[in-house]
Amino acid sequence: MRLLPLLLLASTLLFAEINLPENFQAKFIQKITNTKKHVIQYPGKVQFSDEKRFKWSYVKPTKKEVCTDGSELVVVDHDLEQVSSYYITDGLDIAKILKKATLHSKNVYVAQYKNIKYTIQIDSKQKLHSIAYFDDLDNKVQIVFKNMKYGKGNLPAEKMKCNYPRSYDMIRG
């Protein structure tokens, strides 16, 4: 009889997965550590909706917004008064990354996606807490989320767009 609860627990852990909400909003700190151990921190707010739409609003060291709908990436640098727009074919697909994630230890998951290993941590309420990986330049990237709020339904499309004055320079890539 003692074996049954252990088998149930083992099967639950074996098939545990991270549930992605329809939308989320949070504050974050993105910490980038280069190969010489130099660290730069970028705090801000993030919004996610519709499996592919992101809006990252950075407040330091420069005020910047990064928005994507999965096919176009828009970067607004308010200090430079410049907007860069790129069509992307291979963007960050958080839904696919989380679907590939397997439980590594309590509240820690690991996912291999497009030759990058992601370490994903969830909090005690099963909400996304952090994502860490090494980028193409061997920088360690860690994003820690705070005040994570999950929601149902998609956020309004207008809320997910980067806003900028028409006077900003536009660069298309």
Residue ranges with predicted function:
Residues 22-27, 50-55, 104-110, 125-132:
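Short, hydrophobic/aromatic-rich segments at coil-to-beta transitions
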Residues 78-115:
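Flexible, surface-exposed loop/linker segments and immediately adjacent secondary-structure boundaries
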Residues 30, 58-62, 70-72, 79, ...:
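A mature extracytoplasmic/lumenal domain signature
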Residues 19-37, 47:
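A short, Trp-centered hydrophobic/proline-enriched beta-strand micro-motif
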Residues 40-44, 64-66, 82-84, 118, ...:
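Short beta-strand segments
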Residues 39, 106, 112-116, 123-173:
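Non-transmembrane domains of secretory- and envelope-associated proteins
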Residues 3-14:
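Sec-dependent N-terminal signal peptides
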Residues 45-93:
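An acidic-aromatic
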